[in-house]
Amino acid sequence: MKRHNVNKAPAIRAVTSFIMASALFLSSSFGASVAHAETKTVSYEHNESVDGKISDFKKMVAEGKDLSDKLVIISTNDVHGAIQKYPYVASLKNFFKNELNADVLLVDSGDFSQDKNPEHNNEDADSASCMEPSEGLAGVEAMNAAGYDIATLGNHEFESFVKLDKNLSKAKFKVICSNLVTKDARTELETAEKNNKNDNNALMNTFNSLTEKDYFCAPCYTYNSSKTGIKVGFFGLLTGEANINNISAKKLKDSLALSCAKYQINSLGDNGADIIICLSHLGLEDDRGDHQNRSIDIYNAVKNDPTYKANYPLDLVLDGHSHTLISSGGNGEPIMSGKYMLQYAGITIIGKDTDGKAKIEKSVLVSLDDMKENLGPDEEANATITNIINSYNPSFFGGTPEKTSKEKKSNRSHSDSKRRKSNWARLRWNRKRRSSRSRRAAVIRWRTWRNAEARTRRRSGTKS
């Protein structure tokens, strides 16, 4: 079990970063480091075992075994623009689907719209640097190509350059987030919280009065596996550090996060979910201010706290945000996260016990290196994603970078301006030239007339 300092870049620090960078504007490198990376402390004890081995699953295939009665969930988090690695995740999904005959879901816990690069104190970051040129769209396009089924939102989906509404309209996967609501819904919930401090049931009733229109996107999603008969309910939670600046929705106050989780779990359970999973972009960092809203805090509250205890168990938390490698909690809590940049992926296998009750049979992490060595990339996904990268940043593969739409527009404007200036200069020059020609012609005519007059006078003996 380990405790860590981890590097990450919360967008909510943008204002602080700007102030510090302004005060120390002569030291631009300092400002950049503040804006893009911070050292966060994770003192929560957890396990980092990478027990998953592709070779073990290949051995099952060789022995004629399969997972036809299982639901397999492959999970990722905090990809941060490393979309060139998605073909390996697609290959992992297709391996379980085609070779082991399992029903497979591919899910993500957020931060798929922003790049991370080494110059921002992320030494092992290797983004394809397509997010800003594409306004975040490359992340969604690559996830479509990889075959994602469900994702929640991270704080970096709300970067100022990201066109989130436009991008999500092109997503072929479900997007869920339960604590991102309309302004009116947030006011209603905050009022209910204030007026019913000692009555959490009243707050649950207020949550229950909300409809899907009161949320930015669907708060939850239930997958009904027709192949296995297992129903899995998912809900998403967004960190309070998100700086919502590119959409009209509002995130709930941190004090409402526990109640929000409790309501979603109860709602999913009431609607028949056998297994309930939180796609969490909360992380495990220590500094949460007055409200402890780490993923482990949510899990412990809905399990043990009399106020927030849910009617059904929270079976698994697939976490993101703090870039932590975690296979399980220090006390066996079912929390899993694959660090970041697709360095690891989670594999969760759900089956049924002898009584026919759904249960999680195994949750393990596998490394990207293992996927590369034993599976290789999915060819179709690789071709599509290579084209996506070439569209926005061909220099990644050694080509000439294509200009962004803003650069193209700027260049067009500059070119138009130069052309207009050139045309105006040419017009003025032509006018001058025509005027000059006219003057020269007039002088020539006058000289011709004068010479003719002089010759006439000489012949007649008249002096000029």
Q: Language-model features: where?
A:
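A short C-terminal boundary segment appended to hydrolase-like catalytic domains
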Residues: K352-R412, D416-K418, R426, K432, ...
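Compositionally biased, intrinsically disordered low-complexity segments enriched in Pro/Arg/Gln/His
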Residues: R420, R428-R437, R455
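Sec-dependent signal peptide cleavage junction
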Residues: F25-S43
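Compositionally biased, low-complexity flexible segments
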Residues: R447-N451, R455-K463
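Acidic, metal/ion-coordinating pockets
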Residues: E38-M371
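Bacterial N-terminal signal peptides
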Residues: T16-S28
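Tryptophan (W) side chains
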Residues: W424, W429, W446-W449
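Bacterial Sec-dependent N-terminal signal peptides
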Residues: M1-F18
